[in-house]
């Protein structure tokens, strides 16, 4: 007899067990149905949320203003996949210029601040700035003074045959006065700048003078004679304004232009000097005295850079030694045989330099010259600027710390600065991620690059010194305003030069911004290892805390990423990264050059792809990095906004905002600009960004979705 658990059960005894199993199966089926229903319901709920509660339209006043700006500047009838530049920038009356429009808006803001009534402490920086501005705007007083204040200055320089008796003074004495007291540098320029080589300590640098007739393109050589004739006409007009008869004025103008032409023949293009390794010469004052003896270098430089203590063993950086040698020989020859020609050249040049502070007759003569030169060079005429804009620019040049403080208080408050710094931090993090993924960079170079990025300084809004009114007041103690506007102007010129010298004499010289805080231009300073983003740039339509994040990342974020990539530009130069995979790097750079060369350009463009290569690389990398940062942000944070009535998703709005920054007419571009023409600054980076084609659904093979792309950053 077996064990009890082995006994068989009858059919009747097995019935409850089978019923129990069927019931369990039914329960599982019911549970599965319920779970499927729950999942389906959840999916529908999430679909509803994302469809109806996804990106919300931003309808605040700042967003509606931005919307109006976008609608007015773009041409929505253009297919974005074939011409995104026109889609974003081509308004009905021509291509809009975002940088120029914002620049003018910032100046208008300064104008309103300077026109507003206020009471200032006696002798404060604000009081002197407002007094100078009001003096500049007092055109009745300037017209009443006429050429009297200018003739008085000419008499201090020994006079001139045109304005009265001429007493031939010591040449170097006159030259010292011209440069140190009146800001006119007829034969060379001298300035303090960081040394071009590390550790970038401040050093006096000597460079060519600036000429109105400087030729930049081969086509200008054909109209050289016409340019000279226009310049003679201008100088002749200056002479008659100073009281000369037409024949005498013509003679002095001819003498001056002959001397100018001979100096001009000694100039060499910067690219040529660089190719011949002649752009930087380190010499002592003594050595320069031997090479160019017509100039008393020690006394002249001492006068310019007072209160610096100089001696004959002081080192200088000379940028064109051959020019200085030839200039010295020409001056010596002129002092022996054509002394009056040199005096005419120096005096007429001084009048030209001081024309912004003279009455309208002098300013109109200057303006007509510029317009004629632009016409001969096939460039569009300059628009007529109102008097208030000129006075704002002059006040800003001389009283920058004071106007910077006013502008920042008005346009770049703590909340805006905090939002801008937060954006910069996210862009910087995206750059770090990029550096870690580069295929052509070595591990050692990667560590160096990351360390360099970690040590980077950043300044936003305005220099820290600029917002301290007590410092500004001390800096303006030496300014004496009046009795004439010309005298006020010259007092400010001398004060500004003295402040520049003093800043370099500090034990730890602070970084002097290369741009005013209201300017629309960011930059990277190699000598200070610092990126600077002025308050004037971080304004609508480029940036605002209340904008959709897509706008801020696409516009300001791309600019920030662009400047951060300039930190590593040396890696892209030949021999700049010996530890890198140079084959992969060079292939990427060649790809980039071919990529830009493939785009059609208007016939008026003189684009040189190799000349703009580094900026093109920063443009392409800047957009990619900013988009990477934005994509990360949109995943990690909810509540995305977009602009109504544009029919653009947040990702599409990112690219639209980037293009908006680049809106500019081709004719407004400087021939020496290291950037590509505006349309290429849009099409080049966006066509190299697969996400653009993805989000705008561009068919393969269209302009903005090419079959091949370049991989650099």
Swiss-Prot record:
Assembly notes: Heterodimer with XK; disulfide-linked.
Annotated Zn(2+) binding sites: 562, 566, 615
Lineage: Eukaryota, Metazoa, Chordata, Craniata, Vertebrata
InterPro entries registered for this protein in UniProt: MetalloPept_cat_dom_sf, Peptidase_M13, Peptidase_M13_C, Peptidase_M13_dom_2, Peptidase_M13_N
Compartment list: Cell membrane
Glycosylation sites: 75, 93, 106, 161, 165, 311, 326, 608
Transmembrane stretches, start-end: 29-48
Needed cofactors: Zn(2+)
Annotated ranges, domain Peptidase M13: 57-713
Protein name: Kell blood group glycoprotein homolog
Cofactor binding mode and count: Binds 1 zinc ion per subunit.
Role summary: Zinc endopeptidase with endothelin-3-converting enzyme activity. Cleaves EDN1, EDN2 and EDN3.
Alphabetical list of CDD domains matching this protein: M13
Pfam families documented for this protein: Peptidase_M13 (PF01431), Peptidase_M13_N (PF05649)
Modifications made to the protein after synthesis: N-glycosylated.
Keywords from the named record: Cell membrane, Disulfide bond, Glycoprotein, Hydrolase, Membrane, Metal-binding, Metalloprotease, Protease, Signal-anchor, Transmembrane, Transmembrane helix, Zinc
Family: Belongs to the peptidase M13 family.
């Amino acid at each position: 007899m077996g064990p009890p658990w082995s006994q068989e059960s009858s059919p009747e005894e097995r019935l409850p067990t089978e019923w129990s199993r069927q019931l369990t199966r039914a329960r599982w089926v019911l549970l599965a149905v319920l779970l499927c229903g729950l999942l389906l319901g959840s999916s529908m709920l999430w679909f509803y949320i994302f469809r109806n509660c996804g990106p919300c339209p931003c309808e605040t006043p700042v967003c509606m203003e931005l919307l109006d700006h976008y609608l007015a500047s773009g041409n929505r009838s253009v297919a974005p996949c074939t011409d995104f530049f026109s889609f974003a920038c081509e308004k009905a009356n021509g291509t809009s210029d975002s940088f120029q429009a914002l620049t003018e808006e910032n100046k208008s803001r300064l104008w309103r601040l300077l026109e507003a009534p206020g009471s200032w402490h006696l002798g404060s920086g604000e009081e002197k700035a407002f007094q100078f501005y009001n003096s500049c705007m007092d055109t009745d007083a300037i017209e009443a003074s006429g050429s009297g204040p200018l003739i008085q200055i000419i008499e201090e320089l020994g006079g001139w045959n045109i304005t009265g008796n001429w007493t031939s003074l010591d040449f170097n004495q006159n030259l010292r006065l011209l440069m140190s007291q009146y800001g006119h540098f007829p034969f060379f320029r001298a300035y303090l700048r960081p040394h071009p080589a590390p550790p970038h300590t401040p050093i006096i640098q000597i460079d060519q003078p600036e000429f109105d007739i400087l030729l930049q393109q081969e086509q200008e050589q054909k109209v050289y004679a016409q340019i000279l004739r226009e310049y003679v006409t201008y100088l002749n007009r200056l002479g008659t304004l100073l009281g000369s008869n037409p024949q005498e004025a013509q003679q002095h103008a001819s003498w001056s232009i002959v001397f100018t032409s001979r100096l001009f023949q000694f100039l060499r293009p910067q690219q040529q000097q660089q190719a011949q390794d002649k752009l930087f010469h380190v010499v002592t004052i003594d050595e320069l005295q031997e090479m160019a003896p017509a100039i008393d270098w020690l006394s002249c430089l001492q006068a310019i850079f007072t209160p610096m203590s100089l001696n004959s063993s002081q080192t200088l950086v000379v940028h064109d030694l051959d020019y200085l040698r030839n200039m010295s020989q020409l001056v010596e020859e002129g002092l022996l045989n054509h002394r009056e020609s040199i005096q005419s050249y120096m005096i007429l040049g001084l009048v030209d330099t001081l024309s912004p502070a003279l009455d309208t007759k002098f300013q109109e003569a200057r303006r007509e010259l510029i317009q004629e030169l632009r016409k001969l060079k096939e460039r569009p005429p300059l628009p007529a600027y109102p008097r208030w804009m000129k006075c704002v620019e002059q006040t800003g040049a001389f009283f920058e710390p004071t106007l910077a403080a006013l502008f920042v208080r008005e346009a770049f408050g703590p909340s805006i600065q905090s939002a801008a710094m937060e954006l910069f931090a996210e862009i910087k993090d995206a750059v770090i991620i990029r550096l870690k993924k580069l295929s052509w960079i070595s591990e050692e170079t990667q560590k160096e690059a990351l360390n360099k990025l970690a040590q980077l300084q950043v300044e936003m809004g305005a220099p820290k010194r600029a917002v301290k009114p007590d410092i500004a007041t001390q800096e303006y103690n030496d300014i004496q305003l009046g009795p004439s506007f010309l005298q006020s102007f010259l007092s400010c010129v001398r004060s500004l030069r003295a402040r520049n010298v003093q800043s370099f004499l500090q034990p730890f010289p602070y970084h002097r911004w290369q741009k005013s805080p209201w300017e629309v231009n960011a930059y990277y300073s190699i000598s200070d290892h610092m990126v600077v983003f002025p308050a004037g740039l971080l304004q609508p339509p480029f940036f605002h805390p209340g904008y959709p994040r897509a706008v801020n990342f696409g516009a300001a974020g791309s600019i920030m990423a662009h400047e951060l990539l300039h930190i590593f530009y040396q890696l892209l130069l030949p021999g700049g990264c010996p530890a890198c995979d140079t084959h992969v790097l060079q292939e990427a750079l060649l790809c980039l050059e071919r990529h830009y060369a493939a785009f059609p350009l208007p016939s008026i463009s003189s684009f040189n792809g190799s000349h703009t290569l580094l900026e093109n690389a920063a443009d392409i990398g800047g957009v990619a990095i900013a988009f990477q940062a934005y994509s990360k942000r949109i995943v990690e944070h909810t509540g995305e906004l977009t602009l109504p009535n544009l029919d653009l998703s947040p990702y599409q709005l990112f690219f639209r905002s980037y293009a908006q920054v680049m809106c500019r007419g081709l004719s407004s571009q400087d021939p020496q600009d290291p950037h590509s023409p505006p349309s290429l600054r849009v099409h080049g980076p966006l066509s190299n960004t697969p996400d653009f084609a993805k989000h705008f659904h561009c068919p393969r093979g269209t302009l903005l979705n090419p079959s091949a792309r370049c991989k650099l950053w």
